[in-house]
Amino acid sequence: MARKNIIITLLVLILLALSIGAWYIFNKPHRSLEQAELISVSADSLLASYMQNEKIANAKYFDKALAVNGEISELTTNQSGQSVIILKTQDPMAGVVCTLQEIPETGLKIGQQVQVKGFCSGYISDVVLRDCQLIKEK
């Protein structure tokens, strides 16, 4: 009987710990680009860093806030309906994919120079930035 009570108590404590952990994970504050310190980089140098050594580039850029300068090579939307800007690089088969938080009010054009800020998600044939915002159009 005492053994059964100990097992039930342990199960309740484990469930309580899991519940507290889940609550903490789902309620932690969202990181904001406005509060983050930006690392300025061009689309070409960002892609070159990842192509030369992905491990070193991840240590430098992964999950950090970047301000990326480049020329728009493509404007599209993803499966979720979010606007996506692809920045041109010297490699015709790769670029910097920037998923925007909101649709820009201004009419962006292919070939236009822009500066985009966002969090780097890594490299999968393209460098991927998430939660992007347009800083300035040139």
Regions found by a protein language model. Give the residues of each.
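OB-fold and OB-like single-stranded nucleic-acid-recognition modules
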Residues: 2-138
